Amino acid sequence: MHVSMQTIHRLEQMQELLEQLDPDAPPQALVAPGSPLPRGEIIVFPGSFNPPTTAHLALLKQARHFARLEAVRGRGSMQLYAALSKHIVDKETVERPLLLDRILLLDNLLRRRFPHAGILLFNRGLYVEQAQAVHTAFPQVRRLLFLMGFDKIVQILDPHYYEDRDAALHDLFALAELLVAPRGNEGEHSLDELLQRPENQPFARYIHTLPFDPAYREISSTQVRQHASMHQHEIPGEVRRFMRETRAYAPPLRLPDGTEIDFYALRVKLLETLLRNVSCEK
């Protein structure tokens, strides 16, 4: 199993950043190596990206189009970021691949597909905490929009997630706006209906609809993880290569004698050893 020195160096940089993120500390945001420093107006797309799919890329492309339209309207240029959290709300049970590998994979993908986009890393999973982290870490950010699918806005507006929903939403929308794309059968009309409810109307002006091609609305990272062979057309080439080379989503390989080899577990051990050795040499 070969890992280039360039990859080791990038992994080391990412690992150093991850070690700075403490889930028990106040909200933190860090910018990944090679990413532009956030300033002005930014769009942030938080996700687990496990793995990145063609839907993720299509959504980023649509957000880039939104940013260009905003610039034409005189709002100024907008920076685009994908974001991962060291603490993913409601997704803690998904363990592989390593967050380190996911960051590296996402970085490779963005460098080729969206060279002007960046990656942010958070220590918290809630949108309001991530918004606090952005404004604290990057005070030159004037306007923050979170990019998300329709299922997320339903959760955000659901009173069952809060002790005091309206107070929590006021805290969120004092710091950020939301850019919402259709998901599944829930399109722009569904979002309009949701925002027209009396309890949601006070917050409607902070929530913007992002048109999204229906061809991508049903694509799911979960389906790709569980049934990759059935969803090859939904997986970017760079991701297919990562999956093939690391077997991060594949079960252990069973040999004729009954023994099993977990190739991704071997990769994890190798990376831990390499990073430990590099750290000791400093």
Q: Predicted regions: what is each one?
A:
Residues M1-K282:
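Nucleotidyltransferase catalytic core that binds NTPs
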